[in-house]
């Protein structure tokens, strides 16, 4: 009899066979599931603490997605030859898994939960993110933790006007859509996508298609739980302290209402802090008078937050003005300025209300492309977008340093929005880096980065296919009443039921991200929300187009200029030289950057046009073929008894035989030639070994014949 209580479930999912397995590996974790999708194998584990830490007032969920290089049959690079800090892809996938799981834990559950997913084996054609999300959901489901799942997930492509479920990597490359959707049986919870200017209807259709197709995975997880699940935890939320809620409401309700009449964020924040402090102080007075212990600040803070949420939500649903005085459809005032920084290649300052992004575009060469060492193989990225939000953007102090998960996620969203509207590498050979510095933030800073990024790229002279704008939307739902909010503030983001960000052009959507916190948001509600988002996007695009009609036709004087020439691929080694000696000398002496691709395309870049011209000339000389009948100005390298070695082109010499110097007989070659002397010669013969024979007298004879033909006949 086996020591394992192993349970396996298999199902067909689109074009792939999926296997779920629990009970054999990682048995001391609260839950563990292995997912195998056509040889892409992940191990998802969950551990939940049995009790919350004292004073804990938030849900401490961490999700770590870790790729092991052995899964692709590789040994890690670097001195230590082991995996180091998570890559950007691992961080983004961790966020992707976290987002649909987090809202499914019950309110008041503050026990620490850690989800760890290891990628154990990789089929290069099957991305591991969807198996990882399915595995995390299944591990939580079998663990018995209080979790309102399971969650299913699916990737959807759009090829030849048809949706494709869980496409291979090759299919993703051919698709005009890469969309990931996750949700429960009844509701969509998360959408992440990149698209090539598709309509809202196509995008929503992909979400609905993915949600329908993921049901088979949810059913399989239910079966796995029935046979291999652990007993459900006997966890109950702490009973609500009704007397405390009543007293806090009595003390703070009117002051909170007054605070939310203040339209300025800083003034409102100051007033709210005062209300929180005054309420806590009054409760301590009450407790002191009664001889009891006052409720801790975290508990009081949670009650106050709930009151705030009710105030803001009811005002909006009742048609009253929003926190900053706007109605539900109005976009905040927009100010645009380009060419802000004098010595950068392109820059823009985009301000929308109290959110502001200073965005800078830099142009580089092929050598500046980012090399990504992924499990499926190494590849290069010519477009990079980095998002930074320092603490001063929200008027706070805090840590400044390497980017946090949120910054990496926002940067990727902005990149997704812009990448489909960039010119191809053939049209515009530069590598491009965009950096968005958030200088003020009150909601929707990632979408400000999209708008500012597009404007900075145009300022840098990048011929964008179209203007790209982004807008953040919110949604509040109570029973049958709902309100869609255009261009949400930070406070509205926290207090709403759904926030979603849509970026695109006049023609269609380039990126859509949705995070839904509740069940019950229907396709019809999403349709209304997307239509309102389009209205807001068109308004912003109008502002952007009136400020900047198109890309600058001239690059910045500080940007590198580039020329491209094609050489015979067999000559690449001649340009590079032994140990890189030739190309190193070329770049140092001409002040250029030179990149050579395997197909013989040479890109020369420099801010100095003379240096580029010199580098081009020298490369052409190095790679030129010696042709019979061609005349060259050469340098005598060495004198021999029977002739001279003459250098014609870099690395290409020929023999000028003693009999080919002049017409008369030459007794001593030193009477005619010296080492270092410039001499004009004609190529009279080459052989299959590359040997070249030269003649100087042939040119003398040609000159004599020409002068003779020019002499008029005598009478």
Swiss-Prot record:
Pfam families: KH_1, PNPase, RNase_PH, RNase_PH_C, S1. This is Polyribonucleotide nucleotidyltransferase. GO terms for cellular component: cytosol. Belongs to the polyribonucleotide nucleotidyltransferase family. Involved in mRNA degradation. Catalyzes the phosphorolysis of single-stranded polyribonucleotides processively in the 3'- to 5'-direction. It is found in: Cytoplasm. The keyword Translocase does not apply. Mg(2+) binds at residues 493, 499. One of its GO terms (biological process) is mRNA catabolic process. It is an enzyme of class 2 (transferase). Signal peptide: none annotated. Its cofactor is Mg(2+). One of its GO terms (molecular function) is 3'-5'-RNA exonuclease activity. Residues 629-697 form the S1 motif domain. Residues 560-619 form the KH domain. Its EC number is 2.7.7.8. Coiled coil: none annotated. It catalyses: RNA(n+1) + phosphate = RNA(n) + a ribonucleoside 5'-diphosphate. The gene is pnp. Keywords: Cytoplasm, Magnesium, Metal-binding, Nucleotidyltransferase, RNA-binding, Transferase. InterPro entries: ExoRNase_PH_dom1, ExoRNase_PH_dom2, ExoRNase_PH_dom2_sf, KH_dom, KH_dom_type_1, KH_dom_type_1_sf, NA-bd_OB-fold, PNPase.
